A protein has these predicted regions:
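Extreme N-terminal basic, low-complexity initiation segments
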Residues: 1-10
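Active-site regions of metal-assisted phosphoester/phosphodiester hydrolases
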Residues: 9-60, 92-98, 103-274
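Short acidic donor-binding/metal-coordinating loop in glycosyltransferase active sites
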Residues: 65-66, 190
């Protein structure tokens, strides 16, 4: 299991991190991008995806089903990006870290974290239970400008099968108890495939996490399919952070880009000061 930290090109839009910038909430988004294709793989949408993410302009992106390499698609599609998708999407807007989970003869795919702020460290944890369904947890440390502590960020894409998900969540808990003890600001976001809401019962109890929408007296929001969400598959969990606002991006142009809706949350330090 490999994690590939990337570098962000400097430009005039990101060189200056002012006090006013650090005072505003950090905007984070989680999104299963379906390897850059629309639902049912009908159209290559990675260029539209990049425009949509630039317009949304989050500080942190937790992406699942990111295509690191696919020689067949590159040969078939004339507009297939030359760069791996995490680098193509990040370009000069975000730092990028990628963890390859599933490798095959013609390529690989996995999870990625894109950050406007520096990525200090990155590790991809293999949590595969079933060999035909390889999974990983991408863990990075991100240092927002002006914050006293780095954020521990985990991008998750869990199994379709309940037994495997339970094993993967326990592996996540064991790892975070070791590297991110209580008092450490923590974000876990991604595609949990958790339509039964079992993750809440486990992660909230054992890691002290808060689900982004439950802060406002709601259940985790429906996020699949993107055209008319029916299932609660995707999540944003935080610890030692305050959720200021949360929303779902679905329908319209979002429904044309991927089969999942995107989730966003705006966070500040729990004590109100960086």
């Amino acid at each position: 299991m490999l994690a590939f930290p990337g570098r962000m090109k400097k430009n005039r839009h990101i060189l200056i991190l002012s006090a006013a910038m650090t005072a505003r909430p950090l905007h984070l988004t989680t999104y299963n991008i379906h390897k850059g294709f629309s639902q049912f793989n009908r159209r290559l949408m990675v260029h539209d995806l990049r425009q949509q993410l630039r317009a949304l302009n989050p500080d942190l992106l937790f992406l699942q089903e990111v295509q690191g390499l696919h020689q067949h698609h590159a040969n078939r599609h004339g507009d297939w990006p030359e760069l791996p998708q995490h680098e193509f999407l990040a370009e000069d807007h975000w730092h990028a870290s990628y963890g390859a989970n599933m490798a095959y003869e013609h390529g690989h795919h996995g999870n990625a974290i894109l950050s406007r702020h520096p990525i200090l460290a990155s590790h991809n944890q293999d949590v595969t239970h079933l060999q035909f369904e390889r999974r990983g947890l991408l863990h990075t440390q991100v240092q927002p400008a002006g914050w006293a502590q780095p954020l521990h960020c985990v991008c998750a894409h869990l199994s379709l099968f309940g037994t495997s998900r339970r094993r993967q969540m326990q592996a996540l808990i064991d790892k975070l108890e070791e590297v991110a003890p209580p008092g450490t600001p923590l974000i876990i976001a991604g595609d949990f495939n958790d339509w039964r809401n079992a993750a809440d019962r486990v992660l909230v109890r054992q890691l002290g996490l808060t689900e982004a929408f439950e802060v406002f007296g709601q259940q985790p929001r429906r996020s699949f399919p993107a055209r008319l969400p029916l299932f609660r598959l995707d999540r944003i969990y935080v610890r030692d952070l305050k959720i200021e606002h949360a929303e779902v991006h679905w329908g319209g142009s979002w429904a044309r880009i991927s089969d999942h809706a995107a989730l966003s949350a705006w966070i500040t330090p729990a004590n109100g000061a960086p």
